Amino acid sequence: QNKFISRIISGRNLSVKITNKGYSEIVKLSSILQKSLDSSTSVVNLQGTLVSGMGEGAYYMGLKGYTKQFKSKIGYVPFPGTLNVRLDKKIHQEAMKQFETLDGVKIKSFSDGKRTYGWVKCFSAKLNNSIKCQLIILERTHHDESVIELISKTCIRKNTKLKDGSKISIKIEIDN
């Protein structure tokens, strides 16, 4: 009914498999239970590879409807662009699902009269244990679930020796 499991009948044998939708629900429930049981700060560590984006981050990050909110809610106007990281392991992609249930710092959706721009959730993070940044979760994105986006005060690529193919570690602290 909810498509959380699939039943496979083969002769007299019946197998039950958890679907991707079911797995996502389990991850969400696990996150909710963990939050209710543990009031301390937890840390999510992710690893991936720096990849080029489509250049759209610069456009969206420069929109006044976003920049005003970023300034008031995270304390700065981010560099106009995002740093795209492809998560190399499935376990890191699965770890990202818990952010769907977490509040983060919410940047509200807005309209400019012609179109509506989706909400953004920000989570404080550290790139390679040294560079302060924000992991952003977007209401709308062209990326698949293996690619995450980071924002910062400055152009991370320019201020570091990072380039496409560089290995990246991201540490996100979550207040429960």
Predicted stretch roles:
Residues 69-71, 79-127, 132-140, 144:
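Compact, glycine-rich, soluble single-domain proteins
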Residues 22-45:
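Conserved segment of winged-helix/HTH DNA-binding domains
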Residues 43-70, 76-77, 92:
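Short Lys/Arg-enriched alpha/beta "domain-start" segment
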Residues 152-158:
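Short alpha-helix capping/helix-loop boundary micro-motifs
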Residues 11-26:
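Basic, amphipathic "hinge/linker" alpha-helix immediately C-terminal to the N-terminal HTH DNA-binding motif
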Residues 163-167:
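Loop/turn positions that initiate beta-strands
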Residues 91, 173-176:
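Short, charged beta-turn/beta-strand-edge "cap" motif at the junction between a beta-strand
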Residues 1-10:
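A short, conserved structural fragment
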